[in-house]
C-alpha cells in the first residue's frame, strides 16, 4: 500500500490535497511554548521573536482533518522572551552585519568575518529541560482529548542537530557528538513518551548526507580523521544511533523511537535554487534518482550512490527493525519552473513505489506554481479531491517517460501519472494493461510549461489508451475498467 502520509507540507496546504503538516525548521529548535517566543539563530541575527502559536497550528489541522508532526526542542535552551538578541553591538562592538530594523542586533561576526565568542545562553534563553517539554506534550495531549479529535501523529526530536553549533552557536557553540545526540534523544524522548504514549517519536531530523555518517564533531575536525566516529567503532552515526536506541529498548522495555527522520536536499550545482537553464533543469530531474536508483552516482560533491530511501530502510532493517522512515524536509528547487514541478512529481511517485512512510515538502509550493500542480496531480487533479490511489501497480516505461500507477481495492479503478522528462520532444504513450481487464472509460489531465492549470481532456469511452505526452509535462489518467 502507498502511505497516505507522503503528501506532507510545512505550510498552509490550501487545496493541494496535502494530508499532513509539519511544524519545524530552525525556529522550532528554540520555541518556548509557554511564552510563544522563538529564535531563528543565525538565520536572522540570533534574535528572539514572537512565535507562531502552536495551538492555532494544531486547531487548523484538526479542522482540516490533517495529521500533525510537531518539533520538540531538545537543545536544552529556548527563547526567554520575544525581544532579546544574542550579539548586541553595544556589548560586542562593530559587526559584519546587523539587523536593518534593530540596529543593535549584530550577526555575531567581527567586521573581518571572524566569529565572536558568545556570551552565556541566558542572554536570549532559559533552560528547557525534558520535564519542560513533558509539560508541553501533556498540554497538547490534554487539549486534543478535550477537543475530542487527535491531530498530533508524531513528535520530532528537534531540527538538524548537527548544525546547532553554526545555526544556534550562541546557545550551543560546541559541535554535537555521538554521545550527546544519544543522551538528549533518550532523555527527551522518554519525557515525550511518558506524556503521550500514543504519539510517534521521530528523529534525529538531520540535515543531509554528511550528517548521516558523521557527527558535527567529526566534520568540525575532518571527516578523514573523524575522531568521534572512530571512538564509536568507526560506525556511521545513523546506524549507530539506531542500534543504540534498539539496545535501550531491549534493556528497558521502553521504545523511544518510532520513525527514522532525515532531511534531504539535492547538492548538485544550482539544483536547489530557482535556476531554470536547460543544463540545471536536466540535472534537477536526474538528481531525483538519488532517492531510489542504486545505479545513480550523485552529480555533486557527494559523488556516491545515495539510493536514499533503500539505504535508510536497510539501516532500519539491520539496526532497529520495525521503524518507519520519513523525509522530514525535502525540495528540488525551481518552484516556478516546469523542471521543479516535474522533479516534485517524480519524487511523489517514487515515495509511493519505494514504500516511504512520511514526507514533508519544505515549505509550501506557491499557488499555481508547477510544484503546486505536481501536488495537485497526485492529490486533487480534478479540483474535487480525486487523487492517486492507495495501492501501487508495477509499470514499465521506456525512454524519457516515468509512469506511476495506482489502483483501488476493487482493482476496477486506476489512476496513472505519466511524466515526460524530455524538454523538447513529445512522447507517444501506449498504455497496455496486462491481464484480462479492458478499459471502460478514461480521462486525461495534463500540465506543461505553457499551462496555467491541469487541463481536462474530457471523458472518453472504451478502447485503447494511446496518448501523446507534451514535452516536459505531467499527465494524469483516470481510468475505469470493465
Predicted segment positions?
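Short, flexible helix-coil linker/hinge segments at the edges of structured domains or between repeats
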Residues: 218-231, 275-295
Amino acid at each position: 500500500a502507498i502511505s497516505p502520509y507522503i503528501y506532507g507540507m510545512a505550510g498552509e496546504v490550501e487545496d493541494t490535497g496535502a494530508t499532513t503538516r509539519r511544524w519545524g525548521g530552525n525556529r522550532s529548535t528554540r520555541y518556548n511554548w509557554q511564552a510563544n517566543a522563538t529564535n531563528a539563530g543565525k538565520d536572522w541575527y540570533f534574535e528572539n521573536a514572537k512565535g507562531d502559536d502552536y495551538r492555532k497550528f494544531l486547531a487548523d489541522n484538526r479542522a482540516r482533518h490533517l495529521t500533525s508532526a510537531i518539533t520538540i526542542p531538545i537543545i536544552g535552551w529556548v527563547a526567554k522572551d520575544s525581544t532579546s538578541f544574542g550579539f548586541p553591538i553595544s556589548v560586542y562592538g562593530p559587526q559584519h552585519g546587523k539587523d536593518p530594523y534593530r540596529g543593535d542586533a549584530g550577526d555575531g561576526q567581527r567586521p573581518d568575518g571572524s566569529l565572536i565568542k558568545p556570551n552565556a545562553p541566558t542572554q536570549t534563553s532559559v533552560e528547557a529541560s525534558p520535564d519542560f517539554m513533558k509539560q508541553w506534550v501533556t498540554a497538547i495531549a490534554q487539549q486534543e482529548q478535550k477537543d475530542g479529535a487527535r491531530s498530533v501523529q508524531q513528535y520530532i526530536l528537534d531540527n538538524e542537530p548537527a548544525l546547532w553549533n553554526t545555526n544556534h552557536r550562541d546557545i550551543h557553540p560546541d559541535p554535537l557528538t555521538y554521545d550527546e545526540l544519544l543522551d538528549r534523544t533518550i532523555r527527551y524522548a522518554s519525557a515525550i513518551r511518558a506524556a503521550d504514549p500514543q504519539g510517534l517519536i521521530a528523529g534525529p531530523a538531520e540535515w543531509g548526507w554528511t550528517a548521516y555518517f558523521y557527527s558535527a564533531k567529526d566534520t568540525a575536525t575532518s571527516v578523514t580523521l573523524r575522531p568521534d566516529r572512530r571512538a564509536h567503532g568507526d560506525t556511521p552515526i545513523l546506524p549507530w544511533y539506531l542500534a543504540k536506541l534498539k539496545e535501550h529498548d531491549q534493556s528497558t522495555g521502553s521504545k523511544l523511537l518510532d520513525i527514522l527522520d532525515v532531511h534531504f536536499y539535492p547538492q548538485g550545482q544550482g539544483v536547489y535554487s530557482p535556476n531554470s537553464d536547460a543544463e540545471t533543469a536536466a540535472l534537477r530531474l536526474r538528481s531525483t534518482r538519488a532517492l531510489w536508483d542504486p545505479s545513480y552516482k550523485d552529480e555533486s560533491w557527494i559523488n556516491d550512490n545515495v539510493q536514499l530511501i533503500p539505504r535508510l530502510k536497510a539501516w532500519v532493517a539491520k539496526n532497529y527493525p520495525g521503524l518507519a522512515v520519513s523525509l522530514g524536509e525535502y525540495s528540488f528547487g525551481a518552484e516556478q519552473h516546469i523542471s521543479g514541478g516535474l522533479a516534485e512529481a517524480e519524487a511523489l511517485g517514487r515515495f509511493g513505489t519505494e514504500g516511504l512512510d512520511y514526507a514533508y515538502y519544505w515549505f509550501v509550493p506557491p499557488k499555481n506554481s508547477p510544484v503546486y500542480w505536481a501536488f495537485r496531480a497526485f492529490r486533487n487533479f480534478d479540483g474535487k479531491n480525486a487523487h492517486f490511489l492507495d495501492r501501487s501497480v508495477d509499470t514499465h516505461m521506456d525512454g524519457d517517460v516515468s509512469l506511476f500507477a495506482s489502483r483501488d481495492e476493487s482493482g476496477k479503478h486506476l489512476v496513472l501519472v505519466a511524466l515526460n522528462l524530455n524538454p523538447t520532444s513529445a512522447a507517444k504513450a501506449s498504455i497496455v494493461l496486462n491481464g484480462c481487464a479492458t478499459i471502460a472509460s478514461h480521462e486525461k489531465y495534463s500540465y506543461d510549461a505553457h499551462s496555467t492549470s491541469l487541463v481536462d481532456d474530457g471523458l472518453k469511452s472504451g478502447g485503447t489508451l494511446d496518448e501523446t505526452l507534451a514535452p516536459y509535462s505531467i499527465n494524469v489518467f483516470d481510468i475505469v475498467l470493465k
